[in-house]
């Protein structure tokens, strides 16, 4: 930035310097800072009425120096700002963007595995139910077998007792038959002895003695034996019938008792089986609930671990972003402070430029617009440029 753009009020004076009344020595020297203002303007006689004093020259020199340093500082800050922007862009390009890892595929795999685990658990529970049903059926068949076995043992015991009774009756019958045979043999012996005695007596007495004896009529032993046999057979038949009736009644009562006890036993066994089924069903349900609770606890633990890991990753990401945001804020704050400093410097420089401009405008107002005409009117010369020369 040059002084000509900052100080447009100097155009009148710079145009006047091109006139021939101004000595050549007045055009060579300029102020520091390339303001194109003649430094020896106070040496000309035509400038004697509106010349600057020493303080104004020092002020203009100071303002030119400040303006030059300000422009240099502005250029330096622009260069530093460009360097910082390049460094920020390089750093952003070098840093890899923080991308959250994709867990969707793992989540799908985990969900598929959880579905498979649930299917396997349901299949396991179904197999456990089938095994328990098979155990219940085997228990039912075992109880039925034990019931039939106990009934068979009872029937075999009854048959054995009846066989013992039959053996006793057979022995009794054989004893009675033996007694009948012994009585028959005894009767035959008695008949034979009686006939022998009668024959001996007849032989002793002969025909000499004929004794008539009023005796009881002879008894038919065969008839008596037959009657006795009939009586014993009737007695045996009666005893057999009574024993058979007693056995039948006892068997019926025993069968009734066995049937009633078997019915009671079957009802009790049915109740026991039903209670066992209920208990097994409740145990199966309890086991299923335990398995479900364990699976839910495992799922909850896995979910907590997964979400805690995700939360830690997100927290790390947030921490990194916050740190970067803090750095960016610090950079922005620093740049804002520098900008505020620059704004303050600019405001001060603008204030100084305005002061400088007001001073120049006041000096321009004090200077005549055509100094050559003024000197012609007064009839004076231009001082050191030559006393015999006129200014126009």
Curated annotation (Swiss-Prot):
Keywords: Coiled coil, Intermediate filament, Keratin
Domain of life: Eukaryota
Signal peptide: none
TM region positions: none
InterPro entries in UniProt: IF_conserved (IPR018039), IF_rod_dom (IPR039008), Keratin_I (IPR002957)
Record-marked site positions (Stutter): 275
Anything else known: There are two types of hair/microfibrillar keratin, I (acidic) and II (neutral to basic).
Protein name: Keratin, type I cuticular Ha4
Source organism per UniProt: Mus musculus (Mouse)
């Amino acid at each position: 930035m040059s002084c000509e753009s900052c100080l447009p009020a100097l155009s009148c004076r710079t145009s006047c310097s091109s006139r021939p009344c101004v000595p050549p020595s007045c055009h060579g020297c300029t102020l520091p800072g390339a303001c194109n203002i003649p430094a020896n303007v106070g040496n000309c006689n035509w400038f004697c009425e509106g010349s600057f004093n020493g303080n104004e020259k020092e002020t203009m020199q100071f303002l030119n120096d400040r303006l030059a340093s300000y422009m240099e500082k502005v250029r330096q800050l622009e260069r530093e700002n460009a360097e910082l922007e390049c460094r920020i862009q390089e750093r952003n390009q070098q840093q890899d963007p923080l991308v959250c890892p994709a867990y969707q595929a793992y989540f799908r795999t985990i969900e598929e595995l959880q579905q498979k685990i649930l299917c396997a658990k349901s299949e396991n529970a179904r197999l456990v139910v089938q095994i328990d049903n098979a155990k219940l059926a085997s228990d039912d068949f075992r109880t039925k077998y034990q019931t039939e076995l106990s009934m068979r043992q009872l029937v075999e015991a009854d048959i054995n007792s009846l066989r013992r009774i039959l053996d006793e009756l057979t022995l009794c019958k054989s004893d009675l038959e033996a007694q009948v045979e012994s009585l028959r043999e005894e009767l035959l012996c008695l008949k034979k002895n009686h006939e022998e005695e009668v024959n001996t007596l007849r032989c002793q007495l002969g025909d000499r003695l004929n004794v008539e004896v009023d005796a009881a009529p002879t008894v038919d032993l065969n008839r008596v034996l037959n009657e006795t046999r009939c009586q014993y057979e009737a007695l045996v038949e009666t005893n057999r019938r009574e024993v058979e009736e007693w056995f039948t009644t006892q068997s019926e009562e025993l069968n009734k008792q066995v049937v009633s006890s078997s019915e009671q036993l079957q009802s009790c066994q049915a109740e026991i089986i039903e209670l066992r089924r209920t208990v097994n069903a409740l145990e199966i349900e309890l086991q299923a609930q335990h398995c479900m609770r364990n699976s839910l606890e495992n799922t909850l633990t896995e979910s907590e671990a997964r979400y805690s890991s995700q939360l830690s990753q997100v927290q790390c990401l947030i921490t990194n972003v916050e740190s970067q945001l803090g750095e960016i804020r610090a950079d922005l704050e620093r740049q804002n402070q520098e900008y505020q400093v620059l704004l303050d410097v600019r405001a001060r420089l603008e204030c100084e430029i305005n002061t400088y401009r007001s001073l120049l405008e006041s000096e321009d107002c004090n200077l005549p617009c055509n100094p050559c005409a003024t000197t012609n009117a007064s009839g004076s010369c231009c001082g050191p440029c030559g006393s015999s020369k006129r200014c126009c």
